[in-house]
Amino acid sequence: MAKVKGGLGRGLDSLLANGADNSSGDRLTTVAVKDIRPGRYQARVQIDDEALQELADSIKAQGVIQPVIVREHGLSRYELIAGERRWRAAQIAGLTEIPAVIKTISDETALAMGLIENLQRENLNPIEEAQGLKRLADEFGLTHETIAQAVGKSRSAISNSLRLLSLPEPVQEMLYQRRLEMGHARALLTLPVVEQLELAQKAVKNGWSVREVERRSQAALQNKRPEPKKTAAADIGRLNDLLTEKLGVNAEIKTANHKKGKIILHFDTPETFDHILKQLGIDYRP
């Protein structure tokens, strides 16, 4: 990657505007698919094969609606700046040419445009997104606020995303593979590093929800086991009262270890027995 010179600390608008040698010289044309090489400045690393095939099918039916963005790279060759999924899907669809906007821009502007184009899409995995945001912050000295405005997210969302890169590498890999969600990761970040991996592995193995991981993270911070969820069997006395009130007869619930048990309904006259059957919705006529 070319070293960025003179770009640090500049606002994003200034970066994109000043990075073009001649923005008015942009050309919309068609370019041979084989003459385009992947961009050096892409946030995306992983592309879902199934989603790519769906896009290829759409391109077969409707063509490429939105041009890719490229810049010249050698004689009759082009480097991709934005639109990698469209370019790859076009190859799968068997297209020989693709609509493209040819720009004359610097390395740093190519990086910014490529990152922002990908970050504005929602199908990056959380780690790819965090890595792209970090490059914008590190290589251009942009604040979280400036990055947030550029990609259409809140400043806190940018900060939370960047924090993912402090997780242990195995946990980052789980996020990369989408075995964990962003919500799981936020809960893990509250724990010491040693405990993050252990809880992440258990979450993946057991298929825990975000809420469950949050609960266990909070319990770990309090240095105690998670409190068991309340069940109906945990409040037998209250249930006795409710059942008695509902049926209008003396009800008794007996359990063994709050797992198995029986319900006893007491009656002392035939009329009371008939009343119980009626309350239970049983229409019995001997």
UniProtKB/Swiss-Prot annotation:
GO cellular component: chromosome
GO MF annotations, alphabetized: DNA binding
GO biological process, one term: positive regulation of sporulation resulting in formation of a cellular spore
One Pfam family matching this protein: ParB_dimer
Protein's UniProt keywords contain DNA-binding: yes
SMART domains, alphabetized: ParB
Keyword annotations from UniProtKB, A to Z: Chromosome partition, DNA-binding
Similarity remark: Belongs to the ParB family.
Function description: Involved in chromosome partition. Localize to both poles of the predivisional cell following completion of DNA replication. Binds to the DNA origin of replication.
Protein name: Probable chromosome-partitioning protein ParB
Organism of provenance: Neisseria meningitidis serogroup A / serotype 4A (strain DSM 15465 / Z2491)
Lineage: Bacteria, Pseudomonadati, Pseudomonadota, Betaproteobacteria, Neisseriales
Gene: parB
